[in-house]
Amino acid sequence: MNDQIILALDVGERRIGVAISDADARIAAPLTTINAHPPERAIAQIVRLVQERGVSRVVVGLPLTMRGERGPQAEVVQRFADTLSSALSCPVEMFDERLTSVAAEQMLRNLGLKPAKIKAQIDQVAASIILQDYLDARRSNPNRSHELPHSSD
């Protein structure tokens, strides 16, 4: 799995947390947080990050319900991922992100950060949790894929 840098996104209503893997796709790290609006600008920023960082794959956290079903927010994220997939030449995959924001907030609270600092970092930390979970799952089951098809236009 050498030279496979993977970018992960935690897509929210206002912000998109971004995390990146090391070149061996083993370790995830928070990268940045970008504004979700307007979506066209957010997608352009993600495309630029993919190009600048030599990313080979993008993972988008899919906010399923606790029962594993798609709710309204999952559909919004899916549409965003579909649009992003059309703008990129690398694969885009969806990955279950249940409870990652809760885990990120707890992790930041445990570090003793103040609420304003937590708010500033929670999205990218959640993205790094999504990415680390994805990397771990991929190592244990390398044949599983949630890749989105690219549009042919």
Swiss-Prot record:
CDD domains: YqgF. SMART domains: YqgFc (SM00732). Its EC number is 3.1.-.-. It comes from the Bacteria. The keyword Hydrolase applies. It is found in: Cytoplasm. Its main location: cytoplasm. GO terms for molecular function: nuclease activity. It is an enzyme of class 3 (hydrolase). Keywords: Cytoplasm, Hydrolase, Nuclease, Ribosome biogenesis. GO terms for cellular component: cytoplasm. InterPro entries: RNaseH-like_sf (IPR012337), YqgF (IPR005227), YqgF/RNaseH-like_dom (IPR006641), YqgF/RNaseH-like_dom_sf (IPR037027). Coiled coil: none annotated. One of its GO terms (biological process) is rRNA 5'-end processing. Could be a nuclease involved in processing of the 5'-end of pre-16S rRNA. HAMAP family: Nuclease_YqgF. Belongs to the YqgF nuclease family. This is Putative pre-16S rRNA nuclease.
